[in-house]
């Protein structure tokens, strides 16, 4: 992992390039084999998420609200059952602080963030999803069918 300042600088540059709206960068989720905590493949984080948010944990989403200058790391803290599988891990708040993000929120808040932006007719920027679970998540959040997501993805991010 790079220094906190590296990630802060990268996100600042991204905000300058995109100029307005809300950027949503999805991290990867685990790829389970036959049980949610039985990862079939070694976990590999999405490269774009890793570049801007630096965290290797699954189930995270980075949100950059350019107009309000708010950055949020969204994800759920692990529960007692997960501790059996993963051991002790940092909270989402701690993961956010490690990369210079001052806000963290549970995954359920991502829908509220998206609904708020859409109700105000703000542009929501996202990259074309390549994994089926993220395509479903984009559909749930933004109402964009998986067959249309590549066309609806933000050219400013590509």
Predicted regions and their residues:
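A composition/biophysics-driven feature that prefers long, compositionally simple stretches
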Residues: 1-158
